[in-house]
Amino acid sequence: MIPRVTSTAQTDLTEGADPYGICAADDGALWVTLVHSGAVVRLSADGGRRDYPIGAQARPSVVTVGRDGTAWFTRTGDDRITALDRTGAMTTFELASGSGPFGICVGADGAVWFTESTGDRLGRIDPDATVSYVALPEGCFPAFVAAGADGAVWATLNHADAVVRILPSADPEVIDIPTPGAAPVGITWGGDAVWFVEIATGRIGRIGDDRLVTEFALPDPACRPHAITAGPDGCWFTEWATDRVGHIGRDGTVEEYDLPSSVSEPHGITVAPDGAVWVAAESGSVVRLG
């Protein structure tokens, strides 16, 4: 069954380019990063808004939310990870200079995982605040990271045209993508498999338990899919270059939806507890598809 989008609602956050990452919390709130002005915004389910400025130099990028409601986000500009709890208190972890943290997720055990895109490492922050690292192939440029159902985490290796699977007790398992120049970016666990986007070739990829990669070509190979997230009946993804949102079913069926004409450069995407799809558009707004 393909979900049907019957309406869109746009909420303007900034006058200029800004919204980038977005994540829905269990309480219905949305967390949004403003990558250029340097802030994180919480939009509550009742329409309230609270801004947490951290400085334009921080370039907050991707955000995730833990089971306790704490929002974690990467600061690509100043090489930090920050946790923002329900009270508004911030805890910041300083990383190696020039490491370029980008993707972030919460694992099944509550640990926080993040990518260091220019450091070629995956980092892990344990609940006791211990930080450890997993080295990845040199020059691979890890991008997004997602938690699987078996305790593993998966990350896209943008410059290596590959996906890596990590278990805390095992060596990294690198899985090559068949299409050269795929440049994978977004990745998510889709309930039965790992799904990822190939921004340079306009494809969606799937990796099952057998580690086989299946690729699905999108109608426009130049649409530049960027982020992807799981929903009840498949996955939703953004098409950065065409100002659209797409849905792919588990059988590979693709449906695409145009965003409002005033919206451009969709990046982050999330599915809220009520099933609504939310998109962060760098043009200055978040958009709800329902």
UniProtKB/Swiss-Prot annotation:
Domain of life where this protein originates: Bacteria
Cofactor or coenzyme needed: Mg(2+)
Top enzyme class: lyase
UniProt keyword Metal-binding present: yes
Enzyme Commission no: 4.2.99.-
Alphabetical list of Pfam families matching this protein: Vgb_lyase
Keywords: Antibiotic resistance, Lyase, Magnesium, Metal-binding
Active site: 267 (proton acceptor)
Single GO MF descriptor: carbon-oxygen lyase activity
GO biological process, one term: response to antibiotic
Gene3D superfamilies: YVTN repeat-like/Quinoprotein amine dehydrogenase
Residues the entry annotates as binding substrate: 226
The keyword Metal-binding appears for this protein: yes
Function noted in UniProt: Inactivates the type B streptogramin antibiotics by linearizing the lactone ring at the ester linkage, generating a free phenylglycine carboxylate and converting the threonyl moiety into 2-amino-butenoic acid.
Binding partners and assembly: Monomer.
Name of this protein: Virginiamycin B lyase
Species name: Mycolicibacterium vanbaalenii (strain DSM 7251 / JCM 13017 / BCRC 16820 / KCTC 9966 / NRRL B-24157 / PYR-1) (Mycobacterium vanbaalenii)
Gene name, Swiss-Prot/TrEMBL: vgb
